[in-house]
Amino acid sequence: MEVPISGGGGGERFCHAAQVVGADGEMDGEAMARFAAGAGLLGRGLSYAVVSIVGPQGSGKSTLLNQLFGTSFTEMDALKGRSQTTKGIWIAKAVGIEPFTVVMDLEGTDGRERGEDDTAFEKQSALFALAVSDIVMINLWCHDIGREHAANRPLLKTIFEVLMRLFSPRKTTLLLVIRDKTKTPLEYLTQALKEDIQKIWNAVRKPEVYKEAALSEFFNVEVTALSSYEEKENLFKEQVGQLRQRFIHSIAPGGLAADRRGVIPASGFCLSALQIWKVIRENKDLNLPAHKIMVATVRCEEIADEKLRSFISDKGWLELETAANSGLVPGFGKKLNAILDFYLSEYDTEAMYFDEDVRTAKRQQLESEILKHTYDAFKKMLEHLHHVVLNKFKSDLEQSLRSGEGFAASARYCVQSSMAEFDAGLRDALVKHAEWDTTKVRSKLEQHIEAHATSVRGTKLAELKANYEKKLLDTLAGPVQSILETGEKDSWACIRRLYRHATESAILAFSASLSEFELDQTTIRKMVMELREHARSIVEEKAREEAGNVLMRMKERFSTVLSRDKDSMPRTWKGNEDIRAITREARLAALRLMSVMAAVRLDDKPDKIDRALTTALLDGGPLSQKRSIEFTSDPLASSTWEEVSEKNTLITPVQCKSIWRQFNAETEYAVAQAISMQEAHRRSNNWLPPAWTVLLLAILGYNEFIFLLRNPLYLLGLFVAFVVSYAAWLQYDITAYFRHGTLSGLLTITSGFLPTIMDIITAVINMSHNQKSSSHPPRHRPPLHPQSFRNQAQQQSQAQVQYQAPSSLSSSSSVGSNSDDES
């Protein structure tokens, strides 16, 4: 509570005074906290002192404190009788004294209110005063000095007894204040007091550890005297003023409270007082060093918790955390370090006076808790950094490859630059107080980069391989097909040369391209082998494709050889060709084609396929006589070829036999047609009557022949008719009409004779009309030459004959066919 006191000049000032321990012995922690906060004690650190006063009831303790420190403790009113005024323990702040001085007024001893036997509270309050105070003032009456049973002796005995329950590392100043001083010199009074105190110290039972200990090891004993306040008020106040000066700078070296060992920082004073009183009330020994550690522990924890809460709610940290969750934050570590250092420095400032070991331990815990709270944001930063660096690696690698750099060099450079960028970003994001393990994150990034590089390398190798495979396909497929279609004996020799040249060229270029990837030799050999096998598969696939069309190719080859001569000119069947020999030659060419396509011969191993096919299928061949010697049975009655592996077999012997049978069946018509055309040509060339017919005509027409010789005019007419007929013969190519037989030729000529006569008549009429018109010409025209008429008529006749020739030819052909059937 706050108690107003009167000050000089008639003004009124306030001093913070509070009852912290009631008459019932219970401490009011809230009152203690209110006092500390209101008086400004919490921020004083170690720069404060605690003064308490003990003494008999009614000895003027409260009056002395009020006069000495300007406090407002309740004083006894002498007019109302000598009764107890101070109950329990009161606390206040000294006014106008530096350092900050806490003043405690304790309940007087030897009071009638508690009774003669109730000394428990006296001992407890005395022990509390010794535990928390730097200076303990003992109020004594001057007339009691030297008496054996004076009131001060039980009090001193109580103080020395409770001292044994303390384990304090520092000395406490005992300031003996002699009240109502007489004329006896102070030196004699001091000597008498010290002798009495020494006797009391010697009489007190002490533990073995302190049995030989001197009083000076525990106390600094000081003695002062004051005149009577009631009789010599002015002198009393003057002496109090002099005593007050001794409390100014009391904690400085040489001051009243110079021993500062084990002092509790001001922020922990309330907690310390509460805990000390609790231990005292429980009648336990009070270990002040351990109590100091306890107070430091509790108080440092409170400070650390407060700073942690402040950090968690800090606006700068919240903004930084939000930014880190959404993306990469430049200077993340620097910004977080600044915030962290701020709160750690605040902790250091507030906890600097507590035990160093406790302070350091709690600081580490605070730092650990803050870092634990920030770790998620740091992880997010690493995730963003991982994502950014990985994407940049992908982009840089792709751009480098597009610029034409080799894969291995590009990947190596991009990996180095990306990891350097990651390390720089990691340093930028690290918190200097943290010892977070980032090796796993870095290793994970390296794995992802390596995986992407491996994927890109695989893709590029696949593209490179596909490119060379396509080149091999373009180089081999067409030429191999063309060579196989020729069906020559050296076809596979040509294919082998082509295959080796194309394969070696491709492998040479492919190996040079693979050097950019810096692959191991095992991988290179494997890929080269795969490319070589692909080239072989192209040839084999094309050979199998052509083998599937072997029957069609054989028929084409047969037709080509049969229908064209050695100069590749269309063959005309004039009647003198050897169709049997030509047919054999065509079948031999077709058989050779099937032999070429029967097996893959890339290994240049000899086989007997051609000989077996010729011997077994081509009857009458030059090797047929050796069949019984070389082949004891049918060589085609098998599913495999001799000296040819199954994988290289394209057409089995049984399949060859079946194909040949089908081939013969499908080519018989072409041979029969050739024979028919040859026979037709022969008949067309024999349009003149037979010789016996000519002889018969000569015998039977002898008289008519003699008649013509005797009449030259008839002979001349016959001659003219012959000339005209011959001219017409040549003009209209009458021979062509008789190629398909005499009857068909006559029918064709007869069908075209009437239109020709009509054309001639029309031409004559037109010429006559033109001559009449020319007798009255409007302008001169060139004369019509007779030859032009003939030319015009001839051209029209020829056009008419040519127009009618196809139908006539078809008619003659049909007639000739019918006549042949009838004959």
From Swiss-Prot:
Region (Disordered), start-end ranges = 770-823
What's its membrane topology? Multi-pass membrane protein
Transmembrane region(s)? 689-709, 713-733
Q: What is this protein called?
A: Protein ROOT HAIR DEFECTIVE 3 homolog 2
Question: One short Pfam family name for this protein?
Answer: RHD3_GTPase
Question: What keywords were assigned to this record?
Answer: Coiled coil, Endoplasmic reticulum, GTP-binding, Hydrolase, Membrane, Nucleotide-binding, Transmembrane, Transmembrane helix
Question: Which SUPFAM superfamilies does this chain map to?
Answer: P-loop containing nucleoside triphosphate hydrolases (SSF52540)
Localization of this protein: Endoplasmic reticulum membrane
A single GO molecular-function term is:
GTPase activity
Q: Report the top EC class in one word.
A: hydrolase
* Topological domain ranges for the Lumenal compartment: 710-712
Is Coiled coil tagged as a keyword? yes
Q: Which family does it belong to?
A: Belongs to the TRAFAC class dynamin-like GTPase superfamily. GB1/RHD3 GTPase family. RHD3 subfamily.
Instruction: Report the HAMAP family cross-referenced here.
Output: Sey1 (MF_03109)
UniProt domain GB1/RHD3-type G: residue ranges:
45-260
Q: What's its EC?
A: 3.6.5.-
Gene Ontology biological process terms from the UniProt entry = endoplasmic reticulum membrane fusion
Q: Please describe what this protein does.
A: Probable GTP-binding protein that may be involved in cell development.
Which segments show compositional bias classed as Low complexity?
786-823
Q: Which residues form a coiled coil?
A: 226-246
Q: Which residues lie on this side of the membrane: Cytoplasmic?
A: 1-688, 734-823
